[in-house]
């Protein structure tokens, strides 16, 4: 109970500190809210390595409104790892999530090009005075798949959001990402069968113990389309490359390069950027 992550999307549920790239994908930031005020129930499924989670949320606290004036969301997620070796060194993960919102207060979907301090490149409300568009309800479906074999990890997610508003021609927005990472030093991302998520790269021997730490190479392609019906929010594709060096389990140096293709109202453009980050975990 409280302000917490909504149970949808493995990328959203797991800590961003353990993502293979510095920032979450554009589609996750645009269509899948991070934290909300609500109640979540979760547990192990009937099958081995399966989980379930359901939640009810209402953002009245952040919006400073009465509960009956703010949007209410009903959310659920199911995961299962149907294929795995006895030692879990090879594992296939599947997940599906659903989100329903009564959309009180309307909607606005937007996101930056996977650089936290950049402006929004796609935005459903950029040409609306208030930025907010009305809707009767909003339904979102998310599908996830991941495969890990030793130090190799491949993953992908697809998200689709349907808006019920005949005046906007019932627009549907969608996006996906495909990612991969390879831990050069041989460590393997652990899998949590309790939450149905992958955790961060462990460090076999830190540099402070005379080791090399853990080195990870990563790549991702992401795409989002916020133009449909009468809404022209634009579309964006992003290619990303990254390298991370975990000197110890709590300290890392990582660098990401991204190339972005962006189209809105028939105007096409491209840009690129490089970002470095020092990460220190304090517990």
Task: List the model feature ranges, each with a label.
Residues 1-104, 173-209, 216-229:
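Outer membrane beta-barrel
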Residues 3, 90, 98, 108-283:
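Outer-membrane beta-barrel pore domains
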């Amino acid at each position: 109970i409280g302000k917490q992550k909504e149970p949808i999307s493995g990328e959203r549920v797991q800590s961003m500190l353990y993502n293979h790239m510095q920032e979450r994908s554009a589609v996750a930031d645009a269509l899948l809210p991070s934290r909300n005020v609500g109640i979540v129930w979760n547990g192990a499924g009937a099958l081995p390595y399966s989980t379930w989670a359901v939640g009810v949320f209402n953002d009245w606290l952040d919006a400073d409104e009465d509960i009956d004036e703010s949007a209410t969301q009903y959310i659920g997620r199911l995961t299962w790892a149907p294929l795995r070796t006895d030692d879990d060194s090879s594992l296939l993960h599947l997940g599906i999530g659903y989100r329903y919102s009564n959309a009180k207060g309307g909607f606005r979907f937007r996101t930056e090009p996977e650089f936290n301090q950049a402006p929004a490149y796609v935005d459903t409300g950029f040409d609306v005075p208030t930025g907010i568009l009305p809707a009767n309800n909003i339904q979102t479906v998310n599908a996830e798949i991941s495969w890990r074999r030793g130090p190799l990890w491949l993953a992908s997610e697809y998200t689709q959001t349907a808006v019920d508003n005949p005046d906007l021609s019932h627009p549907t927005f969608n996006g996906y990402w495909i990612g991969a990472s390879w831990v050069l030093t041989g460590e393997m991302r652990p899998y949590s069968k309790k939450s149905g998520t992958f955790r961060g790269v462990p460090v076999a021997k830190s540099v402070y113990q005379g080791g090399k730490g853990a080195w990870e190479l990563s790549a991702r392609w992401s795409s989002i389309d916020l133009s449909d019906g009468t809404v022209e929010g634009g579309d964006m594709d992003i290619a990303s490359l990254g390298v991370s060096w975990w000197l110890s389990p709590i300290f890392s140096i990582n660098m990401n390069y991204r190339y972005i293709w962006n189209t809105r109202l028939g105007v096409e453009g491209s840009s690129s950027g490089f970002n470095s980050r020092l990460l220190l975990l304090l517990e």
